[in-house]
Structure formats: structure tokens, C-alpha cells
Swiss-Prot record:
S5 DRBM domain segment(s): 94-157
Organism, as annotated: Mycoplasmopsis synoviae (strain 53) (Mycoplasma synoviae)
Name by which UniProt lists this protein: Small ribosomal subunit protein uS5
Pfam families listed in its UniProt record: Ribosomal_S5, Ribosomal_S5_C
Keywords: Ribonucleoprotein, Ribosomal protein, RNA-binding, rRNA-binding
Region (Disordered): 1-87
The protein's role, per its UniProt record: With S4 and S12 plays an important role in translational accuracy.
GO MF, one example: structural constituent of ribosome
Family: Belongs to the universal ribosomal protein uS5 family.
Bias (Basic and acidic residues) ranges: 57-87
Subunit structure: Part of the 30S ribosomal subunit. Contacts proteins S4 and S8.
The encoding gene: rpsE
InterPro entries linked to this entry: Ribosomal_Su5_D2-typ_SF (IPR020568), Ribosomal_uS5 (IPR000851), Ribosomal_uS5_bac-type (IPR005712), Ribosomal_uS5_C (IPR005324), Ribosomal_uS5_N (IPR013810), Ribosomal_uS5_N_CS (IPR018192), Ribsml_uS5_D2-typ_fold_subgr (IPR014721)
Length: 248
């Protein structure tokens, strides 16, 4: 009986874990379960469910559609929407002439500093003229500033058959200018600085005379001042409350 009890008893198990087998350095990769292939191509980012509505809106904007209504595409003739808009140059109706360029020297503690000043006259040859002044360290920058300043100083002057309506005189500081009307075909009899103003203003026949200082800025400003003092026959008739025929 004792032998049977000993044979039927289970062997005692040790509490120590079994030793692990030495690793060979290879990793075991488990293959995913076989199933249907994804709808997107390999290497393509999987679309997120929350972005489905955004993708639809982007697709509608790209095709210029919004629901059932169709929007017209952007006007291709408009230069603002052209691809070569950066290369397109802005063409202004005003012509410009450089009257004077001067180099300015400023003496400072470290030495001398040089800069440039430009004086420019612009006009559209249709009764609008103006002048501007600009300063910069380089000549092109000074000219650009002068042109920009001239656009802010535009004035309108009267033109009667290509000449001034009547004789006029104006003075600015030490410069004085006389402008007279001339018959058709006479041309512009004026100095270079006076010619720059009257030609860009749109006059074709004028006789002028300059007195006193020949400074470029003073002469140009005196010419513009003289042109602003001009009055047409219609303007004078309105002031006197008469007809134009009575004045003539």
C-alpha cells in the first residue's frame, strides 16, 4: 500500500523559471492577417474621416462650383490675375523731364557725406503739369522720389489754341518770367527750363522772357505761378457777369 501511494504521488515542481534559449540575433516578424487591400495606393497618405468635408469643399472651389450653382472663372483679361503680372510695367500718362540734378555734400565729424537731389517736371500735354523735388544717396532713387512728389503737386492750366490766353508775368523769389501768346506755327521760344514746363503742359506756341535769377527751381516755380494766373475769356465773362462776345 505504501508503494502504491508513492507511485501515484505527483513529482514536486521547482519554483525557479526555466532557462531561456540563447538569442540568435534575428527578429521574428508577424505578418498581418490577410484581407482586402486598402483603397489608396502604396506611399499615399490615408485620408482621415474628419477631412472628408474639407476635401469636398476644396474640390468644389477648384472646379468653381458651390452646390448646384456654378461660379464664373476669374477673368483672364484682367492684368491682376495674369501670371506675368510681375513683369508688366506700369505705363503712366505723364511724361517727365529732369530739370536739375545736384550733388549735396554734408560735412560731419567723421568726414564728408555725399547725396544727390533731383528736380523733375511732369505733365500729360493736356493742360496738367507739376514739379517735384527728391533727395537720396543715389541718383535713380532721387529721381523716383522727385517724380512721386511731382504727382502730388499737379495743377491744371488753361490752353487756348495751343498758346496762353493773354500775356502774363509772375515772380518767384529772385526769378521773374514773362509769357506772351504767339500765332500758330511760331513754336516755343523759351529757355530750356521754361520750355520743359510749357511743353509738358501742352502749349505749342509761346514767346517767353526770363529776368533775374536763372536758378532752375526758381524759374520753374515762377513759370507755374504765371500759368496759374491765366484766365480764359469764359472765366472773365462769368466774373463780370457778361457774355463772351461782349468782351471780344
Amino acid at each position: 500500500m505504501e508503494d502504491k501511494k508513492l507511485s501515484s504521488a505527483k513529482p514536486a515542481t521547482s519554483s525557479k523559471p526555466a532557462p531561456k534559449a540563447p538569442s540568435t540575433g534575428t527578429k521574428v516578424v508577424t505578418k498581418p492577417a490577410s484581407g482586402p487591400r486598402p483603397a489608396f495606393k502604396p506611399g499615399q497618405r490615408k485620408p482621415h474621416a474628419s477631412n472628408a468635408s474639407n476635401d469636398k469643399v476644396a474640390f468644389e472651389k477648384r472646379n468653381f462650383t458651390s452646390g448646384d450653382k456654378t461660379k464664373k472663372p476669374t477673368d483672364s483679361k484682367n492684368p491682376r490675375f495674369q501670371r506675368n503680372n510681375k513683369d508688366r510695367k506700369f505705363v503712366s500718362e505723364y511724361e517727365e523731364k529732369i530739370v536739375d540734378i545736384a550733388r549735396v555734400t554734408k560735412v560731419v565729424k567723421g568726414g564728408r557725406r555725399f547725396s544727390f537731389s533731383a528736380f523733375v517736371v511732369i505733365g500729360n500735354k493736356k493742360g496738367t503739369v507739376g514739379y517735384g523735388h527728391g533727395k537720396a544717396n543715389e541718383v535713380p532713387d532721387a529721381i523716383k522720389k522727385a517724380i512721386k512728389d511731382a504727382h502730388n503737386n499737379l495743377v491744371e492750366v488753361p490752353i487756348t489754341k495751343g498758346t496762353v490766353p493773354h500775356e502774363v508775368t509772375a515772380k518767384f523769389l529772385a526769378s521773374k518770367v514773362l509769357l506772351k501768346s504767339a500765332p500758330k506755327g511760331k513754336g516755343l521760344i523759351a529757355s530750356s527750363r521754361v520750355r520743359a514746363v510749357v511743353e509738358l503742359a501742352g502749349y505749342t506756341d509761346i514767346v517767353s522772357k526770363t529776368y533775374g535769377s536763372r536758378s532752375a527751381q526758381n524759374v520753374v516755380k515762377s513759370v507755374v505761378k504765371a500759368l496759374l494766373n491765366l484766365r480764359t475769356a469764359k472765366q472773365i465773362a462769368e466774373v463780370r457777369d457778361k457774355d463772351v462776345k461782349d468782351l471780344l
